[in-house]
C-alpha cells in the first residue's frame, strides 16, 4: 500500500498533498480554516445539487418551488437550510482565513495570496447570484440595486446593465442566467482552490512564529488530518445547530414575501457577509465613486504584499501593528453593523468615518507602524 500511494500517478498527487506533505510542526488552529473552507465548498455543492433537482428558474414558479422543496421533498427543508446557513459558515471561515493570512504575514506567498483574492471574489459573486434565486422581495430588489451599480461605468454602463439583465429590468432572463452562474461557479471555485493548494505546496506553509521551518517539519497525516477532523466536526456541529434550531436567524424577513416590482422594501440590504462592502459603497455620495470604493475594498487585499516593509514576518512580535490590526477588525465589525442600518444620521456619518479608517489603516497606518518597528529593532 505504501509503495502504491507513492508510485501510482493519481494516488501520488493525493499523497504529496495530504499524507506525506511536510508541514511546520507548530501551526495552530488558525490554519484549520483552509480545510474547513474545502469542507464548506463540498457541503454547498452537494446540497446545491439536490436543491437544483427541484428548483425552477422561472419568475412565476421560483418562489413556490423553494416552498415546495421545504414542504414536499424528503428532508428538503434540511437541505435548503443547510445550504443557506452553509453559505454563512463559508464566509465566517473565509473571513477568519483571510484575517489569519494578514496577521501571520501569509500574503508574502504572493501567488497563493492573489489566487485567494480571486477565490474570494468568485465566492462573493456566487453568493450574490444565489441570493437572487428564491425570488423573494429582498432577492429581487437586491439584484436590481447591485446590478444597477454597473450603470455608473462611463459610456458602456447602461448597455452593460441591460445586457446582464437580458432586458430592461430584472426578470425571467436574469433569473435563468443567475441560476446558470450559481450552478457553474462553485465548480470553477473548486478548480481554483486546487491551484491555490498547488502554489501553497510549492513554497510550503507559513507558521505562527514567522520563521523558516524547513528544519522542523512533520508529515501532514496523521498529525494534521486528525486536527482538521476535529475542526470539521465542530463546524458541522455549529452548522447543524444553526440549520435545526435557528434556520432563519441570518436571513431577511422580506424574503418570505414573493418578489413584487411594484413594492419596494423599506431597507434594501444584502446578506450579512456583504454588509461591510455595502456600507463602504453607501458612504460615498457619488455613484461611480461608491462602486470604485466597493471594488477596492476587496482588491486592496492585493496591496498587502506591496505595502509590507517590515523586517519581521507576521505580527506575532510586532505590538504596534498588532494594535492597528485589531482596530482594523473592530472597524470591519462597525462597517458590517452600519451596512444593515437605514441611510440616516448618525449611521451615514459613522459609515463614512469607518470607510476612511478601513482604507487608511491598510495604506497609511500599517506601513508607518512597519517603519516604526524597523527603527525600534535598530535601537
Swiss-Prot record:
Residues the record lists as binding a ubiquinone: 201
Where does the chain bind heme b b562?
83, 182
The UniProt entry, under PROSITE patterns, shows: CYTB_CTER, CYTB_NTER
**Database matches in InterPro entries:** Cyt_b/b6_C, Cyt_b/b6_C_sf, Cyt_b/b6_N, Cytb/b6-like_sf, Cytochrome_b, Cytochrome_b_C_euk/bac, Cytochrome_b_N_euk/bac, Di-haem_cyt_TM
Q: Main site of residence?
A: mitochondrion
Source organism's superkingdom? Eukaryota
Q: How is the cofactor bound?
A: Binds 2 heme b groups non-covalently.
Instruction: Write out the GO MF terms.
Output: metal ion binding; ubiquinol-cytochrome-c reductase activity
Q: What are its GO cellular component terms? A: mitochondrial inner membrane; respiratory chain complex III
Q: Which Pfam families match?
A: Cytochrom_B_C, Cytochrome_B
Query: What are the subcellular locations of this protein?
Result: Mitochondrion inner membrane
The cross-references to CDD domains, in alphabetical order and at most eight, read:
cytochrome_b_C, Cytochrome_b_N
Family, similarity comment: Belongs to the cytochrome b family.
Q: What else is known?
A: Heme 1 (or BL or b562) is low-potential and absorbs at about 562 nm, and heme 2 (or BH or b566) is high-potential and absorbs at about 566 nm.
What's this chain's function? Component of the ubiquinol-cytochrome c reductase complex (complex III or cytochrome b-c1 complex) that is part of the mitochondrial respiratory chain. The b-c1 complex mediates electron transfer from ubiquinol to cytochrome c. Contributes to the generation of a proton gradient across the mitochondrial membrane that is then used for ATP synthesis.
UniProt protein name = Cytochrome b
Please give the organism. Akodon fumeus (Smoky grass mouse)
Its lineage reads: Eukaryota, Metazoa, Chordata, Craniata, Vertebrata
